[in-house]
Regions:
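C-terminal peripheral helix-coil segments that are non-catalytic and often amphipathic
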Residues: 1-4, 135, 139-146, 171-220
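Amphipathic alpha-helical packing segments from all-alpha helical-bundle domains
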Residues: 69-75, 121-147, 156-171, 187, ...
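Short amphipathic alpha-helical elements of helix-turn-helix/winged-helix folds
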Residues: 23-27, 102, 165
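Generic hydrophobic, amphipathic alpha-helix propensity
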Residues: 13-25, 41, 66-70, 74, ...
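Hydrophobic alpha-helical connector segments
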Residues: 65, 76-106, 159-162, 186-189
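Short, hydrophobic secondary-structure boundary micro-motifs
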Residues: 37, 110-114, 153, 205-210
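Short linear capping/connector segments at secondary-structure termini
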Residues: 80, 112-120, 212-215
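Helix-turn-helix
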Residues: 19, 27-61, 65
Length: 220
């Protein structure tokens, strides 16, 4: 008769899996993808390296699982912000502001997930995160287009272009430091949200009104 894991065993294995991913996330937040090493993650999780290998046979698989988990978390946050907005254009503005605010609040992790120079294998493992973000922005752009709030454009081209501009402006090597001053962080978020809306063809007065009305999320 084949062995069947009890519910307690299943829960314990799932909890350890989540603890490993949480430790990997902490490592990435502090030191980028270079810090996501099996031994270091094991130490943070309080387990042996061999235990991590039982869940994730290589660093590539660990990074891929981390990307999946963080992607789900960030997309859920963007979707929640968009759904709470009163209309398609407001939903787009809310998602843009939420992305900007969270990227600035977790700048090291955001850089690690999107732009940090890494080995080709690691870059391939984290590519789904950028793809998912671009797809979410594309959906919101299409909704605004369908409602007649944006001039005609190729949403599939505009979305990744917009994402690239936001990443570089928020967390790229050329981005100026926002510091910890809440007022300066809020101003940075609003400025880049305004930039993005203008780039999509929203007239200045309307774009400014949307930015003023959009709730900037508190630091996570």
């Amino acid at each position: 008769m084949p062995y069947r894991q009890t519910e307690n065993v299943v829960r314990r294995l799932a909890a350890r899996h989540d603890a490993i991913l949480a430790a990997a996330c902490d490592a990435a937040e502090e030191g980028g993808m270079a810090a996501v090493q099996i031994a270091a993650v094991a130490g943070r999780a309080g387990i042996a390296a061999g235990t991590v290998y039982r869940y994730f046979p290589s660093k590539i698989e660990l990074v891929a699982a981390l990307v999946v988990a963080l992607c789900a978390r960030e997309l859920a946050t963007l979707e929640h912000a968009a759904k709470a907005a009163p209309g398609p254009l407001s939903a787009l503005a809310a998602a843009l502001a939420t992305f900007a605010a969270r990227a600035l609040a977790g700048r090291r992790l955001a850089f690690a997930l999107t732009a940090e120079p890494v080995e080709p294998e690691i870059d391939a493992a984290r590519a789904p995160y950028r793809q998912a973000l671009a797809a979410e922005f594309e959906k919101l752009i299409r909704n605004a287009l369908a409602a007649g709030h944006l001039p005609d454009q190729d949403a599939a081209l505009a979305a990744p272009a917009l994402l690239g501009a936001l990443i570089e402006g928020l967390i790229g090597p050329l981005a100026p430091a926002a510091g910890d001053d809440p007022a300066k962080v809020r101003a940075r978020v609003q400025m880049l949200t305004l930039f993005a809306l203008r780039a999509l063809g929203v007239v200045d007065a309307r774009a400014r009104g949307l930015v003023v009305q959009t709730v900037v999320p508190e630091p996570r």
